[in-house]
């Protein structure tokens, strides 16, 4: 909820929660507000939006309008799209069994949501998983598997997409005279 924003009174707010929608960020939260991804409209709830959809427009700085809407379809990785993303099978506290960078097999238990097991949907490298102890609602994205086992090193580096988006945020701030103090 970022309720502390008003306590800190920052010069800039960058909403990079990546929830694929605006969870309450307002253009009045700071003198300069950047929204990252779909759900933000430049000039309404932020000053600028950064495009996060892979492709020709990734990292584009949008000064009027919105990012491309969320399609709900994950990007293709190693020939796999929807199958690599795991959603919560129930509502409750998550308890992880597998860890980021583990090689997992299809059907292997990765975690539990409450008492409900969460199984690997494909064989590959576990690229991401929600941290233990978090409450997750039914259907929330909780894990991501990369089918390319040989790309385990990617678990410990910053992706091309993340670098592009971060670079765009820096470009936006510097082009508006916003410098670190």
Where are these regions (language model features)?
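Well-ordered secondary-structure scaffolds
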Residues: 1-181
């Amino acid at each position: 909820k970022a309720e502390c924003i008003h306590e800190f009174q920052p010069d800039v707010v960058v909403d990079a929660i990546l929830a694929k929608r605006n969870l309450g960020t307002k253009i009045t939260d700071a003198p300069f507000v950047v929204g990252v991804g779909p759900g933000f409209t430049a000039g309404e709830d932020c000053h600028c939006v950064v495009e996060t959809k892979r492709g020709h427009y990734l990292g584009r700085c949008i000064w009027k309008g919105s990012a491309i809407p969320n399609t709900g379809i994950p990007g293709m990785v190693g020939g796999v799209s929807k199958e690599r993303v795991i959603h919560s099978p129930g509502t409750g506290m998550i308890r992880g069994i597998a860890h980021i960078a583990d090689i997992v097999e299809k059907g292997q238990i990765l975690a539990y949501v409450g008492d409900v097991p969460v199984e690997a949907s494909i064989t590959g490298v576990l690229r991401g998983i929600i941290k233990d102890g978090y409450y997750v609602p039914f259907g929330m994205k909780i894990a991501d598997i990369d089918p390319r086992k040989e790309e385990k090193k990617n678990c410990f580096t910053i992706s091309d997409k993340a670098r592009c988006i971060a670079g765009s945020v820096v470009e936006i701030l510097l082009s508006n005279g916003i410098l670190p103090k």
